[in-house]
A protein has these predicted regions:
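N-terminal beta-loop-helix "entrance" segment that forms/cooperates
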Residues: 38-60
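N-terminal beta1-alpha1 ligand-phosphate binding loop
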Residues: 1-32
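Structured helix-beta-strand junction loops
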Residues: 31, 58, 77-78
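Helix-loop-strand module that forms the ligand-binding subsite of alpha/beta enzymes
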Residues: 63-111
Length: 111
């Protein structure tokens, strides 16, 4: 199984949240070997979604040329997506929220 982990903490490897995530992943590795890749969202160049919906008329391709294209390909090839983040003001950190907003292109079109 291929697992893609999104670390949304601005503290990257020093994040308490990521330490908990590693404990969870260690348990999964003990149960059955997994291929695990971690993306530190803070280290990636991901522009804000413009809300233009060009992706809905452009075969699911976003018009913004940044690292999100590569990330979307990794997401689509993964068997499991794991979002690891601390709560900031009862929500996810801004960088991870930005990534989630940019996940729109591969979604099926709505009526």
């Amino acid at each position: 199984m291929k697992i893609l982990v999104f670390n949304g903490s601005p503290k990257r490897e020093n994040s308490d949240t990521l330490h908990i995530t590693h404990a969870f992943l260690d348990g999964m590795q003990e149960a059955a070997p997994q291929e695990i890749q971690t993306i530190h969202v803070t280290d990636r160049r991901i522009a804000f979604c413009r809300g233009c919906f060009a992706c809905k008329h452009n075969d699911g391709r976003c018009v913004i040329d940044d690292e999100m294209r590569e990330i979307l390909e990794q997401m689509l090839s993964a068997d499991l997506l794991l979002f690891s983040f601390p709560l900031h003001s009862y929500g996810m950190p801004a960088g991870l929220k930005n990534l989630v907003d940019r996940m729109l292109p591969p979604c099926p079109p709505w009526p």
